[in-house]
Every structure is written in C-alpha cells, then in structure tokens.
C-alpha cells in the first residue's frame, strides 16, 4: 500500500468526559498491512459541499420563477441609496487606547481632498455583508468500525492543515468512541479552523454575549450595532447562529422603532432586505416619511414590488403607473398592515411640505 502523504492533526474535543486529558500532537500516518488504519471500503469525496449563494440557488430554477437576490445589481443599488452616507456616524470614535488628537492646517484644496478620501473610506466600511441561505447540516458517516468501539472515551478530530486548501473544502473528520468515522459538523469545523488558522476577533467557543439574557441587555442599551459587529466577527454568514442573531436584532429594532441605529452602517441593507422579504416594512416606511426621507420611502416600496411582483401593491402600481408618493399610497391601500397610519403620516408630511413652500 502506498504511504498516506497527508499530515493530519489529532485533537481531543473539549466535550470529553471529566478527567480525560486533551491530546494534541502532529503525526504522519503510515498505514501498515494488517493494522487498524486501513483504506475505507467505499470511496468518498474529500471535499465538502460549498456554501450555495442565493443567486446560485435561483439559477437552478426556471427563468420565469427566478426570484431577485440580495446581490442583484438593482437590489444593491436600492439598498445602498437607503443606507445613506453619514461620515460623522461612520467614523464615530471607537473605544481604544487614549492618544492625543492630531490637528492639521489645510488649504481649501487639501480639505476637499481629505473629504473625498473620507467618503471613499466610508463606502468601504459600508459594504454590506452577504445575506446567504442557512448552510445544510453535515451528517455524512464515512465508516462504522466496531472493532474500535470502547477503545477511547473521547472524540478525536483529524484536520488537514495544508495552507493551499480553502477552509470550505478542508477535510475534517471525527472519530467517535463508538468507532464511527464521520465528517465534522459545521460547528466542529469552525472550532478546529479557528484553532489552527486563528481569525482576529473570533473565539473558539461562542462568547456568552450571545446568550438570550445578555442580548436583551445589549438591546436595552441601544447597542445593536455592537451585537452585529461581534456576530460578524464570530460566525460565518450562512451559519445558524449568525442568521438567528441578525434576525433577533432586526426584530428588536422593529419593535422599538429605532431604525436609525443602523442607518449609515453596513447592516442597514440586510435589515431592509429582511423586512421586505417578510412583508414587514410598515414601521420602517413610517419612520422614513417622518424623517423627511421620502425618496428612501419610495425606494423601499419599489424594492417591495421587485421582491413581490405578483402582490396587489405591485399590480396596482403597475396598472396606475404610480411613481413617487403615489407609489406609497398604493401600498398603503393594498398590502400595508398599518395602512391608515401610513396614509395619516403621509398626509402630515404633505401638509408640512405645503406650509414650507408657502412660507418660502
């Protein structure tokens, strides 16, 4: 038999029973004839299913039923407009080591150039994280070696640590005390990859900040952005925890009506996408009208029609060729859950606009 040339790491999981030592060592495995470590009787792929972007999933269906995705150019354009660009908010002071401030004397040209650079840097900071479908659980069993049952009391993880392999395709397997050899779950993969390829800001074990009671405390202090920043650093965008924390945060913002907390942040677009997908845009729409963001309100209804083209609102707007404020009125009369409230808010806005025009 040809020697096995892949270097693997052996790691005893943290979930082992009390009193059992954790083992970590590097070994180059050389199979021997008649030994326990033999080639598997059946062939299997060394890779793992890659995460499937929503656009790829949509392409598998028929062109007629293709649903717009988060990364579509039209969708991204609308979300970027609604996010806004507030340099004061984007570059607000962060908690860090105290240093004396730096003052510069600039000419008008230098000031304009510095402002331009700040705007470009802000656009990079406002780049929206991807919105992905939840990844499919890994339940692949590779072998059932009953001869190994009872020889160990802990699980062992074998990880291919070659640098040239993308993490999503990295081969990681788990040997159970029962003798079962299986592919590692996503959670086990994330922990092992963090052990051997540490990512800044990410912990091996999930921080306690993501416990329900701690999240409620953070929300009560209006620290929703901090929660999302920590979530983005800790979890993969298609993991169950990432999606769950984001949805909880969006729901809390909607309940409190504090949409402005995420405006001019990288998470505003994801929040809007969540509300539009779940047909819960009434609160955000009212907030935009009250803040004199009528263009954003129109864009919100436009995006709603893009995602729900067969709804009464989209059909009504198409029949009436509605634009601008009329687009909002059509939505309020057809699919809005708080239609009367939206119409009243819109009426108040128009009256204030008329008074302002008359005064000027």
From Swiss-Prot:
<keyword id="KW-0007">Acetylation</keyword>
<feature type="modified residue" description="Phosphoserine">
    <location>
        <position position="54"/>
    </location>
</feature>
<dbReference type="Pfam" id="PF10245">
    <property type="entry name" value="MRP-S22"/>
</dbReference>
<dbReference type="GO" id="GO:0005763">
    <property type="term" value="C:mitochondrial small ribosomal subunit"/>
</dbReference>
<dbReference type="GO" id="GO:0005739">
    <property type="term" value="C:mitochondrion"/>
</dbReference>
<comment type="similarity">
    <text>Belongs to the mitochondrion-specific ribosomal protein mS22 family.</text>
</comment>
<dbReference type="GO" id="GO:0032543">
    <property type="term" value="P:mitochondrial translation"/>
</dbReference>
<keyword id="KW-0597">Phosphoprotein</keyword>
<keyword id="KW-0225">Disease variant</keyword>
<comment type="subunit">
    <text>Component of the mitochondrial small ribosomal subunit (mt-SSU). Mature mammalian 55S mitochondrial ribosomes consist of a small (28S) and a large (39S) subunit. The 28S small subunit contains a 12S ribosomal RNA (12S mt-rRNA) and 30 different proteins. The 39S large subunit contains a 16S rRNA (16S mt-rRNA), a copy of mitochondrial valine transfer RNA (mt-tRNA(Val)), which plays an integral structural role, and 52 different proteins.</text>
</comment>
<feature type="modified residue" description="N6-acetyllysine">
    <location>
        <position position="211"/>
    </location>
</feature>
<keyword id="KW-0496">Mitochondrion</keyword>
<dbReference type="InterPro" id="IPR019374">
    <property type="entry name" value="Ribosomal_mS22"/>
</dbReference>
<keyword id="KW-1274">Primary mitochondrial disease</keyword>
<dbReference type="GO" id="GO:0005761">
    <property type="term" value="C:mitochondrial ribosome"/>
</dbReference>
<keyword id="KW-0687">Ribonucleoprotein</keyword>
<dbReference type="GO" id="GO:0003735">
    <property type="term" value="F:structural constituent of ribosome"/>
</dbReference>
<keyword id="KW-0689">Ribosomal protein</keyword>
<dbReference type="GO" id="GO:0005743">
    <property type="term" value="C:mitochondrial inner membrane"/>
</dbReference>
<protein>
    <recommendedName>
        <fullName>Small ribosomal subunit protein mS22</fullName>
    </recommendedName>
</protein>
């Amino acid at each position: 038999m040809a020697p096995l040339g892949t270097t693997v790491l052996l790691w005893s999981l943290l979930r082992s029973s009390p009193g059992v030592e954790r083992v970590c060592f590097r070994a180059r495995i050389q199979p021997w004839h008649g030994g326990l470590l033999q080639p598997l009787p059946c062939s299997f792929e060394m890779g793992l299913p890659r995460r499937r972007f929503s656009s790829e999933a949509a392409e598998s269906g028929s062109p007629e039923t293709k649903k717009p995705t988060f990364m579509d150019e039209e969708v991204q354009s609308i979300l970027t407009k609604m996010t806004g660009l507030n340099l004061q908010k984007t570059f607000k002071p962060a908690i860090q080591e105290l240093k004396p401030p730096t003052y510069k004397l600039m000419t008008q040209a230098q000031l304009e150039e510095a402002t331009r650079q700040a705007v470009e840097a802000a656009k990079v900071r406002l780049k929206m994280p991807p919105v992905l479908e939840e990844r499919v659980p890994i339940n692949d069993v590779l072998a059932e070696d009953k001869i190994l049952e009872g020889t160990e009391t802990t699980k062992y993880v074998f990880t291919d640590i070659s640098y040239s392999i993308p993490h999503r395709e990295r081969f990681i397997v788990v040997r159970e005390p029962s003798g079962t050899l299986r592919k590692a779950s996503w959670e086990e993969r994330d922990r092992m990859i963090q052990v051997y390829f540490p990512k800044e800001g990410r912990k091996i074990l999930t921080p306690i900040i993501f416990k329900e009671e701690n999240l409620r405390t953070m929300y009560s202090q209006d620290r929703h952005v901090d929660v999302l920043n920590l979530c983005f650093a800790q979890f993969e965008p298609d993991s169950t925890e990432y999606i769950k924390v984001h949805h909880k945060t969006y729901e809390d913002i909607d309940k409190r009506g504090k949409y402005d907390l995420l405006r001019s942040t990288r998470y505003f677009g994801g929040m809007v996408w969540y509300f539009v997908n779940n047909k819960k845009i009434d609160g955000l729409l009212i907030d935009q009208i009250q803040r004199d963001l009528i263009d954003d309100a129109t864009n919100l209804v436009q995006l709603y029609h893009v995602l729900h083209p067969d709804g009464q609102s989209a059909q009504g707007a198409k029949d009436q060729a509605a634009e601008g404020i009329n687009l909002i009125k059509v939505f309020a009369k057809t699919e809005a859950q708080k239609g009367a409230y939206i119409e009243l808010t819109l009426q108040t806005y128009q009256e204030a606009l008329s008074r302002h025009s008359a005064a000027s």
